[in-house]
Amino acid sequence: MGPLATAYFIEMVVKMTDAQFDYEHIPMVIYNKPDTPDRTKYILDKNMDNPLCAMMSLAKALEGQGVHYIAIPCVTAYYFYNELSEGIKIPIINMVDETAAYLKNRKIQRVGIMATNGTITGGFFRQGIEDLGIKVVEPSGKCQDKLMGIIYDGIKANKPFAMDDFCMVEKELRDKGAEVIVLGCTELSLIRRDFAIGTGFLDAMEVLAQKSVMLCSGKLKEEFNDIIT
């Protein structure tokens, strides 16, 4: 639903697949519909347009195309995961649960989350991680405002933004004891791609891409087994 994030997700899946020839790659059906009502706006204010109907229409359209799994490269959309899953007969890969499981398997004990206001307020990412016994720290209000500026005024608007703001949020989460910081917004994946942000990050969209390759009978390149920087 975010066009840049969607394009990058496709690139991730292709690059993660160990394929020598085109026909060894995973067949994909892409439905890019950026006019879907904003998920964060609705989570914060239920008087805003509810995106569920539009997302359900997308899911049913993909189901009609004969896909076996649906991957949604938008973390905030997982606020609606249960309702979407109940409305179709094919599985939606749960990026939140898969990220939490990945952290648990790596024995991470304390995690920081960078995400939209919708994801933070909705609490579903925090809950998904805490359910596996991992402690979660989140940005303060001031740092969250900086992060939203990066996501909405910078990346989504395709405009420059201050990496110093990103570093400020990172420092706060590290100071709170985060061993790993989850990039819990697919727009933030583009920062991971375009900037040298250092170690100790896990990109939730990379987890989704990795799981997509594995579920769809693709062969995962060995270098993508460990995706914590």
Residue ranges and their predicted role:
Residues 1-229:
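Non-catalytic structural scaffold of enzyme domains
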